[in-house]
């Protein structure tokens, strides 16, 4: 038994094997023919030899491993029919590609081969094994192949011949023509076959060959034009898709920026709201309105008086000039030990409020303290003085020390 495979089928399988990242498998399509060789020697002795030749014309690759059998090596006929379809009768074998393995059939492959032989009904089913071997430094790559015909006892190796790859002698070429499966080619031959072939299939005229050639070229050019148009359409569609993708990405970026800006504004507003005081600013410790009513009752007894630096004479002058003395606020003058703790009035106004208008600390004083405080208060403030003289006197006279530094000038509540 001998076997041969067409050049383009062998090159296609080798190309697929070299460029694949994993193992793959498929089916071999072709036919099996018988050759009879009759030889006569010089001694008038004739010898007849019959040779069975397996011709592989095409192949049908599978999409992945385990496509027509399961992990238990059981062949599924439905999957097999779905892969082969109408080519089931042309199957003469199957092939498999493995990397860096020995060129021997595995037990799984032997089990699958027996099932395929029974299901397909081909007794001479063959198995073609491809293996790709490379050296350690990847300097040499070798693609090895071997054809098996499994028997009951052992796996018989069959020599595989590839036409047009050896010597260019006539013996290396195939005797029978390879069937062409192209529909366009069959259509052209059907139209122009009667012009240069007789009924017996003998060529009539060589001129008809050129006509067929021109017709084929026209078909090819038409197909090329259609392919070019379709490629242009695909390019334009791809450009539109890329443009839409860029627009979508840009809109997403804009929305993300807006969201970040809103978050930044919210984060800025939250600290500002947290820093705002929860209560209104307090008024000055003591003072009088334009009508002369005291606001001592409105202040809390525990609030300390503001520093004297806030009521510096220069500051008072600027305040009086701008506000036209509509709202004048003065702090009590520093007083000696034992003096009254009543606040002095500005603009010639005297304190005429009742005891309810005093601070709780001031109203807690005894009767004797009140009498001495009234005398001291009259000595310090002269009713005959005009508001302007008092203002000038307060401007020229300046306390030497801060009330916080001199314990003699501090205000004490009488208990």
Swiss-Prot record:
- Annotated stretches, region: Disordered: 249-323, 336-415
| Domain called MPN: residue spans | 3-149
Q: Where is the composition biased (Polar residues)?
A: 312-322, 337-347
Q: What does this protein do?
A: Component of the BRISC complex, a multiprotein complex that specifically cleaves 'Lys-63'-linked polyubiquitin, leaving the last ubiquitin chain attached to its substrates. May act as a central scaffold protein that assembles the various components of the BRISC complex and retains them in the cytoplasm. Plays a role in regulating the onset of apoptosis via its role in modulating 'Lys-63'-linked ubiquitination of target proteins. Required for normal mitotic spindle assembly and microtubule attachment to kinetochores via its role in deubiquitinating NUMA1.
Q: Where is the composition biased (Basic and acidic residues)?
A: 251-261
Upon gene disruption, the observed phenotype is: Mice are viable and fertile, and are protected against toxic shock caused by bacterial lipopolysaccharide (LPS). IFNAR1 'Lys-63'-linked ubiquitination and IFNAR1 internalization are increased.
In the induction comment, the record states: Up-regulated in heart in response to ischemia and reperfusion (at protein level).
Its family remark reads: Belongs to the FAM175 family. Abro1 subfamily.
Assembly mode: Component of the BRISC complex, at least composed of ABRAXAS2, BRCC3/BRCC36, BABAM2 and BABAM1/NBA1. Interacts with BRCC3/BRCC36; the interaction is direct. Interacts with BABAM1. Does not interact with BRCA1. Interacts with SHMT1 and SHMT2; the interaction is direct. Identified in a complex with SHMT2 and the other subunits of the BRISC complex. The BRISC complex binds monoubiquitin and both 'Lys-48'- and 'Lys-63'-linked polyubiquitin. Identified in complexes with IFNAR1, IFNAR2 and SHMT2. Interacts with THAP5. Interacts with ATF4.
Name the Pfam families for this protein: MPN_2A_DUB_like (PF21125)
**Annotated spans, Important for interaction with SHMT2:** 215-222
Locate the compositionally biased regions of type Acidic residues: 368-379
| Alphabetized GO MF terms | microtubule binding; polyubiquitin modification-dependent protein binding
**GO terms of biological process kind:** attachment of spindle microtubules to kinetochore; cell division; cellular response to freezing; chromosome segregation; mitotic cell cycle; mitotic spindle assembly; negative regulation of apoptotic process; protein K63-linked deubiquitination
The name of this protein is BRISC complex subunit Abraxas 2
Task: Please name the PANTHER family in this protein's record.
Answer: ABRAXAS FAMILY MEMBER (PTHR31728), BRISC COMPLEX SUBUNIT ABRAXAS 2 (PTHR31728:SF1)
Q: Name one GO cellular component term.
A: nucleus
The entry's localization annotation reads:
Cytoplasm; Nucleus; Cytoplasm, Cytoskeleton, Spindle pole; Cytoplasm, Cytoskeleton
Q: Which residues form a coiled coil?
A: 215-266
**Domain of life, per lineage:** Eukaryota
| Originating species | Mus musculus
List Phosphoserine occurrences by residue. 274, 280, 368, 372, 375
Comment field (misc):
Interaction with THAP5 has been shown in human, but rodents lack a THAP5 homolog.
Q: Is Coiled coil found in the keyword set?
A: yes
Task: Describe tissue expression.
Answer: Detected in heart (at protein level).
